[in-house]
């Protein structure tokens, strides 16, 4: 646990990898799947995995994947969203790119049906999984030719790209003219010193999962606009992300706690619970939001 805390303070790429390798198992056993996003919750949502799949579908529609040909998914994790998208948009070719080699290897195993996955296997039966390619690379130096893709997406991963502006520069380079960069990420919405202890406390679980730069909304928008992109749309969905997730955990804590403490120390579950409460409060008071941003290369 000390190492996890140190990772949140140092916040370099290796720390982000170690952090996600440590916490992804926790997310998997509590959600029942390999999607590593917060999820989108509405009145019909019954559980975290359903919320995650809903957000993945929503993000694909927001990115206009029905008209896309070549998609670069940066920070793809276990590629669960990519497997979902390839089943929904069969003409799509997806390059899954991640600096985390361990997660890429697991994603390749899922792709070749060598391991079980509650979402992936359903998608694989209906899709051309050979249109998914896995590349071990950093987000700021993409091993991709100039003007070779029509979509670059970062699905709840751009908050870890350091420096963020270099990711935007690389996205501009590899995108065709009028190509889209599409981002889903948590942002800070109220002015505050992002490194201050009060904000660290207010962020709750985001202090762990948001292990890189804590970007303010205006910084994200200005960086995108000053590097050759025109922002086409922004959706603010934090009210359907943070609070409902925390409420689900509160309502089902006894069951989820029994699952977690089989594999993790009891104090970690306590930290998780208190962090979710802090995250809910931060969202309620307007300190944080969750955005979907779409911008076109000009």
Question: Where in the sequence are the language-model features?
Answer:
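Short, glycine-/aromatic-enriched active-site segment of Class I SAM-dependent methyltransferases
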Residues: 187-211
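Acidic carboxylate diad motif detector
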Residues: 183-185
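A short glycine-rich, Lys/Arg-flanked "PGG" loop and its adjoining helix->strand segment in the class I
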Residues: 165-180
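N-terminal auxiliary segments of SAM/dcSAM-dependent transferases
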Residues: 1-29
